[in-house]
């Protein structure tokens, strides 16, 4: 943890007032909520497609299809839950920022204290302003204490929010067998043909904003979508290959 107690209120107050604010964090939270909703929709659509397919075709291949697809459906469910939880934690971090900013001493008040103290010291030739100078210094010490305490609490709240975010797993491997893979591909085409483009545009790229949390989307040369949270990959989605 940074030593906020070593920093005067001029620095602590100015930093939090001039920062990017909670906007980038809230944008990331909205993106994760949208992603959670889309994953849930994908799961429901996939399950519906499976039900429709199984109503018209039953046999060994259909049973194999169920066995191969259920882990993917479960992964969609779990990942949607984790994405929603991440949105909650990001919102908590944004709220912590707003509370900290409201509790910080305004920079203008700190500057006014320093200017008034300097002026009083400059004209205190006979000690007539000594009491007022002491009062100003006491006020300044209180500002120092208040800012340092607020920043320390804010740091702890943000760290707790980040550490509470979920770990995202890669989607399960799909069947390598040609017939089963073809059937799975048919189901995916039923609902997920444009899934990759949807996911890419769901989560905003807030890496361009400065803030304690970064969230970007990346697509590698193999077509795998990766969501990077604080520099670490947290979720990936890869389209099922076409046959």
UniProtKB/Swiss-Prot annotation:
Assigned keywords, A-Z: Cell membrane, Membrane
Whether Membrane counts among this entry's keywords is yes
The record's disulfide annotation reads none
The highest taxon in the source lineage is: Bacteria
Which PANTHER family does UniProt cross-reference here? GLUTAMINE-RICH PROTEIN 2 (PTHR46766:SF1)
Q: What else is known?
A: Protein expressed in vitro is immunologically active and reacts with antibodies from tuberculosis patient sera. Could provide a specific complementary diagnostic test for the presence of and infection with M.tuberculosis.
Question: Hey, which family's this protein in?
Answer: Belongs to the mycobacterial PPE family.
**Protein name listed in UniProt:** Uncharacterized PPE family protein PPE36
């Amino acid at each position: 943890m940074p030593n906020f107690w070593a920093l005067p209120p001029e620095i602590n107050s100015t930093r939090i007032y001039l920062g990017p604010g909670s906007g980038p964090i809230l944008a990331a939270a909205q993106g994760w909520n949208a992603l959670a909703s889309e994953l849930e929709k994908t799961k429901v659509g996939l399950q519906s497609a499976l039900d429709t397919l199984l109503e018209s075709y039953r046999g060994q291949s259909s049973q194999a299809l169920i066995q191969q697809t259920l882990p993917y459906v479960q992964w969609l469910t779990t990942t949607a839950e984790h994405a929603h939880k991440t949105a909650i934690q990001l919102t908590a971090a944004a709220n912590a920022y707003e509370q900290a900013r409201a509790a910080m001493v305004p920079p203008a008040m700190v500057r006014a204290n320093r200017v008034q103290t300097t002026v009083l010291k400059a004209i205190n030739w006979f000690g007539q302003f000594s009491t007022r100078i002491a009062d100003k210094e006491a006020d300044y010490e209180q500002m120092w204490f208040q800012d340092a305490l607020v920043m320390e609490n804010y740091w702890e709240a943000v760290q707790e929010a980040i550490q509470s975010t979920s770990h995202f797993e890669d989607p399960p491997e799909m069947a390598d067998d040609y017939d089963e893979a073809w059937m799975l591909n048919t189901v995916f085409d039923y609902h997920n043909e444009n899934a990759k483009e949807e996911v890419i545009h769901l989560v905003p790229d807030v890496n361009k904003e400065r803030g304690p949390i970064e969230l970007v989307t990346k697509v590698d040369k193999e077509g795998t979508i990766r969501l990077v949270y604080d520099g670490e990959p947290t979720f990936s989605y890869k389209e099922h290959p076409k046959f």
